[in-house]
Amino acid sequence: MIQPIYIFLLVALVVSVTIAMLVLPNILLISHKKKLFDMPDKRKVHHAPVPRLGGLSFFPVMLITMGGLVLIYHLMGLSSGSMHGEVPYEFLALLVGSMMLFLVGLADDLIGVGYKKKFLVQIVAASLLVASGVWIKSLDGLFGIYQLSPWVGMPFTVLIVVYVTNAINLIDGIDGLASGLCAISLVALAGLHIWLHLFSFALLCITALGVIIPFWFYNVFGNAMRGRKFFMGDSGSLSLGYIISFLMIHLSTVDVSPHVVSDYNMVFAFTTMLVPLLDVVRVVGHRLRNRQNPFLPDKSHIHHKLLRCGLRVRQVMVAICLLSLMFILLNFLMIGHVNITYILGIDIAVWIVFHLVLDVILHTRRAEMDI
């Protein structure tokens, strides 16, 4: 017989999708009435004005869905053995931090906010998680490092939260890419949290996934000329990145014997977002090498590179999502058999080879165009 908690999680997904489907058309209507558009320019891929407030639905819908369903679940007396007893402080910190990033992202979408101010808010939001007890206490043997002192682990966690949040924000450059990668990550994280019987965290994954699904269809299949297309905007990417970073860090530090996945929780958690994490390192390195401001946008991301190889936007989105799935499968197969440091080394080697292949393709295309 299926346990009530699994039915509850399925209901949560349906409710989240349904509420998002009801909210998104209204945001779209308001965006067009108020002319709240992301205008095309030489750096951007789209060629028509598109509303950038799709992410406006993310945090409120998640809050309503998760809060409402948890209340109903407890009123029905179903809390025993599933979500009962889990400490709420980390969720309160997540709530406040998500609200902060949602608001600064919304302000950036509407009037523009400088990157320095956004970084400051991200650091404060990340510090809230650390203050609630969610911080990386061990590297699980990465580079031979295990336990971290609070003086190292706490600031390191703040850095990781800011890193993950911005990685998702920066990869949001073509239709369906950021939302697709986040959806893949959330499915994987939800699965592992369910396996570990951490149902409150699985619920968070599933409600976030439920919001992303209808947005993804608007973003990928919507017609901008007919007013049926959305972009995520910073209100969506920043709050979503923050929530995913929270889930990844929590999974990296949890100890729930006998369901524990040994020292490889961190590997699995960060593998789910490996493509954006590796891409932002390469992009920042490229900008510094060319003496450019690493915080200002350009066209050096992986999706720009694939577009220059001749792929269409949707093909690029599918290719990068498949690459993310490949990393997840590869690392999952290596877990328990390969040292964590070697896993990271293999991932980086695969990433480098992938870009070397793209460079060869680009060089060949340029040579053909010069003939």
PLM-predicted stretches and their roles:
Residues 39-53, 228-233:
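Juxtamembrane helix-capping/reentrant segments at transmembrane boundaries
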Residues 48-51, 83-92, 144-154, 269:
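Short aromatic-rich membrane-water interface segments that cap or initiate transmembrane helices
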Residues 155-165, 177-178:
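Function-critical hydrophobic alpha-helical transmembrane segments in multi-pass membrane proteins
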Residues 51-71, 127-131:
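A generic, lipid-embedded transmembrane alpha helix
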Residues 65-82, 102-113, 131-143, 252:
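Transmembrane alpha-helix boundary signature
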Residues 82-124, 129:
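Hydrophobic alpha-helical hairpins/lids featuring a short glycine-rich hinge
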Residues 2-35, 62-75, 81-84, 88, ...:
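Alpha-helical transmembrane segments
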